[in-house]
Curated annotation (Swiss-Prot):
Family: Belongs to the eukaryotic ribosomal protein eL31 family.
Organism whose genome encodes this protein: Methanococcus aeolicus (strain ATCC BAA-1280 / DSM 17508 / OCM 812 / Nankai-3)
GO CC entries: cytosolic large ribosomal subunit
Record-level GO BP terms: cytoplasmic translation
Classification of source organism: Archaea, Methanobacteriati, Methanobacteriota, Methanomada group, Methanococci
Name under which the protein is recorded: Large ribosomal subunit protein eL31
Originating gene: rpl31e
Annotated HAMAP family: Ribosomal_eL31
CDD domains tied to this protein: Ribosomal_L31e (cd00463)
GO molecular function annotation: structural constituent of ribosome
Pfam families: Ribosomal_L31e
PANTHER family documented for this protein: 60S RIBOSOMAL PROTEIN L31
Sorted UniProt keywords: Ribonucleoprotein, Ribosomal protein
Gene3D superfamilies cross-referenced by the UniProt entry: 3.10.440.10
Amino acid sequence: MEDERIYTIPLRDVTNNSPSTKRAPRAMRKIRDFLKRHTKSDNIKIDNSINEKVWERSLNKIPARIRVKVVKEDDMVIATLIK
C-alpha cells in the first residue's frame, strides 16, 4: 500500500533553542523525529534535496520551516522536498 502526504515541518524552535554551530544538524534530527512521529515508522529515507535545503545558507542560518512530500511504501518512508 502506498500512501502520500505533504507536511510542513517547523524548524523555528531549533533556531531559537540551539547555538549557531549546531543548528543544521539539529534541524536534520528534528525532521527525522517529526517524520517518525507522524508516519509511525522507524525506517525513514530523507532525500538529499532536503539536506541541501537545510545546509543551503550554512550551518547557522536554517530555514524557519520546510515542506516535504512523504511517500510510505510497506515498511519504508521516503521524504522529498517540495519546491
